[in-house]
A protein has these predicted regions:
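Cofactor-binding beta-sheet edge motifs in enzyme active sites
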Residues: 1-505
Length: 505
């Protein structure tokens, strides 16, 4: 087969303000690659998305490859949260598969002089009766690009042969053998090692002292230590670079540093009162019916208050990243769950267009929401820019647990009632102090201001899934008290069930 035929492919893409977003490429040899901007956090989406694409293309699962979270090739589909990969992010991939199959079927019908309805796909070969042709025959050495048609007709689930059937997780064999490459295993030619020195305001990301607390450090005291390459400072960001990771940590621990101490956090011993007293802005999500009237019509009522404390991820492995400044075209190896958002943050950090930064996503130790995976990418990139080499940074366990955005504390006041044994009225007010955990390097360097920010969170599952005539659902948006971001919503599964299970008065 000639070189032209070998490079032939059918591409399904979408135009966006930021450029073309490719969802699928079908190749001459009967294989296909799907592109999805989400990442696998241990849920097996690589296999699941492969099944979806193989189903629509009528290809064997082994002939389908899925590329996840690589900013150079995958579309920006937002963060990998909840179950949105299959519910939302898989939709254009499924449509692209259906569209590609329809295109190839139409080409085969012309080539074989056959009714398009009688065209069959088997193992990457297109057949009509005793006649057949390959994808290479249909592509004829051409690269074809089609705009995604969101009206493409996908398969009826009753015709599924792959989706819904058992399939071995592609990632598990190597993981079970200890051969799977995690972010901690990345080793780049010329790589050196960094270690960061955090300020004394651990776990805080708002206040006038953020980025303004470093008084001095004594580089002369450590310059002669084994492996020393550099000390790097930007505002309150302070790190060292050395030839080996153990040398970097030893130098960081020996470096004399003087800080201004932050003001204490008041009121954490009584978290309920502290949350209630914080400045907040109420945001009504559902005020259908008339709750005041409805609760008065109830035969049975309940009023409960629930306090959810701060939680940490407690990941089995501290966050790690490798960054290569690469002469102003950075490449970052990361365990992030938000590769495209991370790319934007890093662009702000080093004053580059986001599109000029490449994020290569590797699986990490995992978390239940936002942890330090993005922070450590900023650390590594600042150090790499300073020394001109790829730099690996891995936090210590203490740094990880002290600085990770905690699952936000939450106060929930719930009232509800039954009328004739049916849900009739339900109200919940919740206070949720979070700002989504801005990238720490942006704050420490002063690239973004540290004033308290509110974020419209705390509402993900707050509206009950039941029919309730009278509702009053309110989130009180508030700035964080300590560094906090998302960690698994509990509204629906905890407050609603707790209210239902409460003893009668």
């Amino acid at each position: 087969m000639n070189d032209v035929a070998i490079h032939a492919a059918l591409t399904i893409y979408e135009e966006r303000p930021s450029g073309s977003a490719v969802y699928l490429r079908v190749f001459y040899d009967g294989t296909a690659t799907g592109y999805n901007g989400h990442v696998d956090l241990g849920t097996g989406i690589e296999t699941a998305l492969g099944q979806i694409l193989a189903e629509e293309l009528d290809l064997p699962l082994a002939s389908v490859r899925i590329e996840l979270g690589h900013t150079l090739s995958t579309p920006d589909q937002g963060p990998t949260i909840a179950s949105e990969t299959i519910q939302i992010a898989a939709i254009p991939l499924r449509l692209a598969g259906a569209q590609a199959r329809a295109y190839l079927a139409a080409q085969a019908a012309l080539r074989l002089n056959a009714p398009i309805a009688d065209i069959e796909f088997r193992e990457g070969v297109v057949r009509w009766g005793d006649h057949s042709c390959t994808f290479a025959d249909l592509l004829q050495g051409q690269s074809v690009a089609l705009l995604l048609d969101r009206s493409s007709i996908v398969k009826n689930p009753s015709d599924y042969r792959i989706v819904g059937q058992k399939a071995g997780r592609r990632d598990l064999p190597d993981k079970l053998r200890g051969a799977h490459p995690y972010i901690h295993d990345v080793d780049v030619i010329g790589m050196v090692h960094g270690h960061v020195i955090r300020p004394p305001y651990a776990g805080r990301d708002s206040g006038a002292f953020i980025g303004q607390s470093l008084i001095s450090y004594g580089e002369d005291a450590v310059r002669a230590m084994a492996g020393f390459i550099a000390v790097v400072r930007h505002g309150d960001f302070l790190g060292v670079v050395a030839e080996r990771t153990d040398q970097a940590q030893a130098i960081a621990e020996a470096l004399p540093v003087q800080w201004h101490l932050p003001p204490p956090i008041e009121g954490m011993e009584n978290l309920r009162d502290t949350l209630k007293a914080q400045p907040s802005t109420p945001r009504a999500l559902d005020s259908s019916g008339n709750f005041a009237r409805g609760i008065g019509e109830c035969d049975v009522t309940r009023t409960r208050t629930y306090l959810w404390p701060y939680h940490e991820h407690g990941s089995i492995g501290p966050s790690c990243a490798v960054a290569d400044w690469n002469d102003g075209n950075p490449v970052v190896w990361s365990g992030t769950q938000n590769p495209h958002m991370l790319r934007g943050d890093l662009g702000v950090l080093v004053d580059l267009p986001a599109e000029q930064i490449e994020i290569r996503r590797y699986q990490a130790a995992g978390c239940y929401g936002r942890n330090c995976a993005d922070d450590v990418c900023g650390d590594a990139l600042l150090l790499s820019r300073a020394v001109g080499h790829p730099v690996r940074v891995q936090l210590t366990r203490a740094q990880e647990h002290l600085w990770e955005p905690k699952g936000a504390a939450q106060l929930m006041e719930v009232q509800g009632g039954l009328k004739s044994r049916n849900l009739h009225a339900y109200a919940i007010d919740t206070w949720y102090p979070s700002n989504r955990g801005p990238n720490l390097a942006l704050l420490l360097t002063g690239r973004i201001s540290p004033e308290p920010r509110t974020s419209d969170m705390g509402d993900r599952t707050i509206i009950p899934p039941y029919r309730v005539p009278h509702k009053h659902i309110v989130v009180h948006d508030m700035a964080p008290i300590v560094r906090a971001a998302w960690m698994r919503g509990w509204h629906r599964f905890w407050t609603a069930k707790s209210r239902a299970a409460a003893p009668r008065r």
